[in-house]
Structure formats: C-alpha cells, structure tokens
C-alpha cells in the first residue's frame, strides 16, 4: 500500500510539473500550446497591421499558424472564451504572391487546411489573406481582402 501511494504521488508531481512547464513562460491570458503562447486581441486591424503588431512582441512572433484539428479546436475554444465581441479573427495564412499558393507568415508547413465549404474562392480576385470564420465557431477558414478589419490571434515563444 505504501509503495502504491508513493508511486501515485510521484506520478501526480510529474504530471503537475509537465503542466507547469507548458504554461510557465506564457504571460497571463495567453494560451500555452505545443511550446507556443497564443493571444487573441480585440483590436480591429487589417492583416498586415495585425502581423506587424504580433512581430513587435519579440522576434519570432507572428499571426497564429494552425497545424491540426486539435490545435484548431483548442484555439477556437480559447477565442470564444476571450474575444469580447463577435467577429472574424485573422490567422497567419496568406497568399503574398497572389498565385493561390497559401503560406504561413511564420514559414511553417501548410500541412493542414480547414477551409469552409467553397473556399478559398478569391471572390472578385482580391482575397489573399485568411481569417477564422466566426459563423463556424472559429473552426473554418475563409479567404478575404487583406484590407478588411478583423480581430487577430498572435503566436509567440516566450
């Protein structure tokens, strides 16, 4: 019985230590996930201004990149909890060469895509930036003009 209790307590200590390691370096109100910290901002900015805002935190910060269904679900829940008003949210995916080749602003792999049905459609030939669509609970993406004013989510390593 004593050994079982010792092993159980040891496992709890390790579990709490790992949880703390995941969140120890993120500022308050930032979401720790996969070695990054994420923060949604209620300000309205165009895509370029939002990306520059994120970069000013520290080198290596960008609009968020999303690489799995699990990441998408966690970010959607976080945004729903912390965004003070309804509206779309910029992410780091864009088409800087205007050739329908989507890249993340942090240059990470585009190994995961979550377009809403019928997207990307490049309506009026002017949609080169991507936002999380509020109407889908922030789970699906839409291409839109980069000049649109939306909330945004930054991704940083602290």
Swiss-Prot record:
Residues 1-20 form the signal peptide. Keywords: Calcium, Disulfide bond, Glycoprotein, Hemagglutinin, Lectin, Metal-binding, Secreted, Signal. It comes from the Eukaryota. The keyword Transit peptide does not apply. This is C-type lectin mannose-binding isoform. The keyword Metal-binding applies. A motif (Mannose-binding) lies at residues 119-121. It is found in: Secreted. SUPFAM superfamilies: C-type lectin-like (SSF56436). GO terms for molecular function: carbohydrate binding; metal ion binding. Residues 33-155 form the C-type lectin domain. Expressed by the venom gland. Homodimer; disulfide-linked. Mannose-binding lectin that binds to and agglutinates erythrocytes in a calcium-dependent manner. Disulfide bonds join 26-37, 54-154, 129-146. Glycans are attached at residue 121. Belongs to the true venom lectin family. GO terms for cellular component: extracellular region. Ca(2+) binds at residues 127, 142-143.
